[in-house]
Amino acid sequence: MKRLRRLLISLMITALMAAGMPMTAFAKPDWPSDTGIESEAGIVMDADSGAVLFGQNIHVQKAPASITKILTALVVIENSSLDDTVTFSHDAVYNVEDGSGNKNAIEEGDTLSVRDCLYLLLMRSSNQAANALAEHVGGSRDGFVKMMNEKTAELGCENSHFANPSGLNDDTQLTSVYDMALIASAAYKNDTLLTISKDKSYRLPATKNNPDGVTIQPEHKLLITTDTESPNYYPYAVAGKTGYTSVAGQTLVTYAIKDDRRQIAVTMKSTQATHYQDTIALLDFGFLRFENVNISENETAYTSGDQPVQIGDNSYQPSDLSMDTSAVITIPKDASFADAEKTVVTDLPEHAPLGAVALL
């Protein structure tokens, strides 16, 4: 019996960035490049294709502050049960940076489920929840940090090093807007994490200082603003995370959906006056100037005809090949699929599907 081979098509058009200046694989037309953001670093990435639609200093390392907690949540969800019980140790509660606060007045000995802690982590940005979850999942904070850095390597992050699960100041806690976009893209593909991040409120159970429980809400203004006249009203925002320290400045991750297109925007080293408006500018830029095109509907050279197809060192019959029907490329709206430069890659990554023979 002839063994069916599958040609994995995961073509994406990406803008290469150098010192914030976009360059493109297109000969025509020019890649759009005008967003006018004021943050020191910013990016908007298509979450389906992985294409960088605009970037400014995208590989420059900066302190992330509490957007770190997106990575923390992802590692926790992948390595624990939501119904596990987490006990807050003395170290989890009190071994934090002076002045960093204690959201919801958690005390040593308080117990919450992993689910409760994740809501406290992502909605209220609790450093105590970050520490307690790290101890629960990693056995220690250091053990969990090792898991965080292993996860970033798995996701292809090349300019990141995490030293704690909360994002509090540490000279070695550094990442880039590009790496954070990779992390966020993976995180919001996780159904549990996305559900928690989308919720507008959550009821925490009783703790020592809140014996009747307490209702918490997100802090990300683009997620909670309902006044259509507000400059922070953005109905396409679905999920995200805020961050701030004296070193990092304002940092922000936002996941938005419009017309079935999904985008990730990240800004770092911003100010209170600019980070939300920069994010809206980035997201609008991506939604208005780009579109996604299905690859399998436009690329037929490998799967049609009766002549053998050469891929790398091997030859295949077109009838033995198929394409990933969900794969898309992101292109400017004034470009076409024919404008894309195509490269066949046969050195496949470890996570490639069984039977895949190439990436296009």
Predicted features and spans:
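Sec-dependent N-terminal signal peptides of Gram-positive bacterial secreted proteins and lipoproteins
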Residues: 3-27
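Generic "edge-of-domain/loop-turn" microfeature
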Residues: 18, 22-24, 49, 93, ...
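Active-site-adjacent loops and short helices of periplasmic peptidoglycan-processing enzymes
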Residues: 25-178, 182-191, 196
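Membrane-helix interfacial "entry" motifs
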Residues: 2-3, 112
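Domain-terminus/edge residues, biased toward the C-terminal soluble/receptor-binding domains
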Residues: 157-158, 172-174, 178-179, 184-360
